[in-house]
Amino acid sequence: MKGPFNLSEWALRHQSFVWYLMFVALLMGVFSYMNLGREEDPSFTIKTMIIQTRWPGATQEETLRQVTDRIEKKLEELDSLDYVKSYTRPGESTVFVYLRDTTGAKEIPEIWYQVRKKINDIRGDFPEGLQGPGFNDEFGDVYGSVYAFTGDGLSMRQLRDYVEQVRAEIREVPGLGKVEMVGEQDEVLYLNFSTRKLAALGIDQRQVVQSLQSQNAVTPAGVIDAGPERISVRTSGQFQSEKDLANVNLRLNDRFYRLADIADIRRGYVDPATPMFRFNGTPAIGLAIAMKKGGNIQDFGKALHARMNELTADLPVGVGVHTVSDQAEVVEEAVGGFTSALFEAVIIVLLVSFVSLGVRAGLVVACSIPLVLAMVFLFMEYSGITMQRISLGALIIALGLLVDDAMITVEMMVTRLEKGDSKDQAATFAYTSTAFPMLTGTLVTVAGFVPIGLNASSAGEYTFTLFAVIAVAMLVSWVVAVLFAPVIGVHILSADVKPHSAEPGRIGRAFNGGLLWAMRNRWWAIGITVLLFVLAVFCMRFVQNQFFPSSDRPEILVDLNLPQNASMDETRKAVDRLEATLKGDPDIERWSTYIGEGAIRFYLPLDQQLQNPYYAQLVIVSKGLESRTALTERLQKRLREEFVGIGSYVQALEMGPPVGRPIQYRVSGKDIDLVRKHAIELATELDKNSHIGEIIYDWNEPGKVLRIDIAQDKARQLGLSSDDVARLMNSIVSGSPVTQVNDDIYLINVVGRAEDAERGSPETLQNLQIVTPSGTSIPLLAFATVRYELEQPLVWRRDRKPTITIKAAVRDEIQPTDLVKQLQPDIDKFAAGLPVGYKVATGGTVEESSKAQGPIASVVPLMLFLMATFLMIQLHSVQKLFLVASVAPLGLIGVVLALVPTGTPMGFVAILGILALIGIIIRNSVILVTQIDEYERDGYEPWDAVVEATEHRRRPILLTAAAASLGMIPIAREVFWGPMAYAMIGGIIIATLLTLLFLPALYVAWYKIREPKRD
């Protein structure tokens, strides 16, 4: 009668086919490795949409009530909505739609469609004259390649012509996605009028505008069917240059005026300026290039570099092309570094195998590694997983685990060969005795990573490939151990294996002595272990908490926030002062400056800032990590001492979901003045803590407004309306569009405005002469009064409530999460004293960390259920399930021993490692308990079964622990993986020792096993 199916026995009977499978797997794995995409970090979805609307001429309050509030109300109908945030300026509304962090990436396109549909449904409710709404759901696009074009002796228009030329030519690069220009300034033809002169001539500026628009209009003149052909009729008159404008003769009030005689015509750039861009302090135009999704960044980078080199070689002298950001180079360095770490880990694991198992047995284990890696690479290619920080780190972590099964199989084969079995018998016995305990251990280990795989947050999406790669590697390693390793083993292992000496060595004797002491003094052993565990729990308070560490890239971000009523020109002057201190700094490779907006998203986790005239951001590339640290300290000191009154923040690039300033508190309520008052009080309270850095508000101070109160009855008698006066004032102060001039590929706006002397001072507005429809001129003060008042220029709201966010950096080495814990009693006390309807909420690092860890906590019960189910299938005993599971929490002892002395923080990734540690620990425990069962079935006394099983499984358990822990050494020095590696190394080492000492003591105590009396 045949026994149960034995996969190893089947493999030995079909060796040719198995060798063929191994060859195909290796070959396909090599090709997959070559085809895998390369990235610096895994992508994750930015679950944010921006809705922008303009209502020219409206006040901030009108825009808030009639536009922003209507949009926010409608968005509340979204099922997946987390919250709505908005800011409203006079005539401008910007609404941010944030989806719940657990929203799946595949659901988001449909949700954005629903947002557009809902807002379109209320278009009829918006006021007249509204422009938009416009939708931006491509907020997360990454422009990995950014070039700066500078022009020595060239105007901005001339430089832009060359940039446009390059932009058009690079379209042929394979894989090219979006291309954006940064810092370009649109040309404008200004018609600067003297209002006094126009009034003296009795000319209404609106007449001038109407005449120019009529002449420049593009109107069809018809088509003539002339027999066999069609002839289009064209009229002349369209403006092609400022000269055409200057020569226009206008008929106004039955007289002809040459435009150049009544207006000063100048070609310039839009004023006030749009966001500006600089490179190393020199005005520049940036060209930001994104790759299409799913491409290979290294291949794309090579093709782009080659094409850019061809194009820049043809540019004239004076045009400089500089690299601002090169993602392909960054990825090549990052992947190269991680690939080197992977090979280091392979060498370490192989050394462990050869030293512990011997050359032949170690060679069998060595052969299993490329087989597993090949099949994992194959899976990665077909599932769309690229080689990046997370997937390569997962491979390194998996490497120490995937050799476990092969080691156990080979060690069992060697043991049976020592007892005189043939190679085939040894291989089939290894399957019978270890295959299913190994499978259970593998499934339990994989279950430990389930919270990562099922975490739907942005952080979970960022780390998902950790679960996918490790899970597949573990499952494949079991297949290799039971299918391929026996076949390799029968060819490599020697049939004439000499038995090991029955007498244990010095280490073996010491271990046996410790084991027997623990079993004989079981309650002491259990008590000491429990005491150590309680001590470890207590010491967890000394472990600093962290969300994600800073990136190891050399860039530094410097934010400058001027008072919110500051002009773009004032911001530029502040930047000039800072850039003057950067020139010649030995720690700086290069820098780029964005004035009036934040840096374009050249790096996915960038906390991108919107356009604001009072804001600037510098991206400084240091010459290395040491230079980055020194430069950061110098900049912080300089900004604090020399840039008083300007909010500044210096930071390295972030990893994981973007946060910005780590300490954030939101104060919200109904009344803006009360919200401002409470926000200032809270900021004052925060400033008392010595660890709090510079504090800023996202909005606070009111701005000055010049209000013109029109006497409506007098205005109507003169034939004027409020609309007429508002349009006239706008054309005088800011300028109003008149028409456009076609200039090559550009459409240049012609803008009419008052001359500099008349629009440069608020006082001059009071003396303006207004031309009435009857042609007479009258001073503004004849029917209006002018006065100053304060108005809120900007209002941020969250979930339809005015909300001020207080933001601060952290001084010293304290982690933001720990600082928030320190502050919490004071915050609670402050919040308790607020009126009803006003509240304080914590944001920043703590909030983002909570969003990431919340989904993990919700999946932990499923993880425990899966582990318990797999264990019950293997053990068939609730009592043994308890014994095996009891060792898992004890890994915390090793975690604390590793983290506290080294000062390593506990971050999001370290938490994932600790959860995974549970499965790894249980894996060894279940193998030991299963071995005890086998010895008892073979007739051993219970005491002897525990002793023999522990001694028998000691070597493979220690070997797998050594491979798993030592294999993580290459990533322990990485900023990102270091905390996880330290936690897992410490946990594995201590838990392994406890598995071999505490578990036997607990086993004999639980089953009340006594040591038999010996004769």
Regions found by a protein language model. Name each.
Residues 1-38, 432-434, 501-548, 589, ...:
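Signature of alpha-helical transmembrane segments and their immediate interfacial
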Residues 5-7, 62-138, 196-217, 238, ...:
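Solvent-exposed, membrane-proximal periplasmic/extracellular interface segments of envelope transport
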Residues 16, 24-62, 106, 120-129, ...:
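Transmembrane helices with small-residue packing motifs
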Residues 20, 59-66, 103-114, 144-147, ...:
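Solvent-exposed, non-transmembrane alpha-helical starts
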Residues 324, 331, 335, 410, ...:
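Helix-loop junctions and hydrophobic alpha-helical segments within the transmembrane domains
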Residues 399-413, 434-454, 461-500, 618, ...:
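Transmembrane alpha-helices and their membrane-interface boundaries in multi-pass membrane transporters
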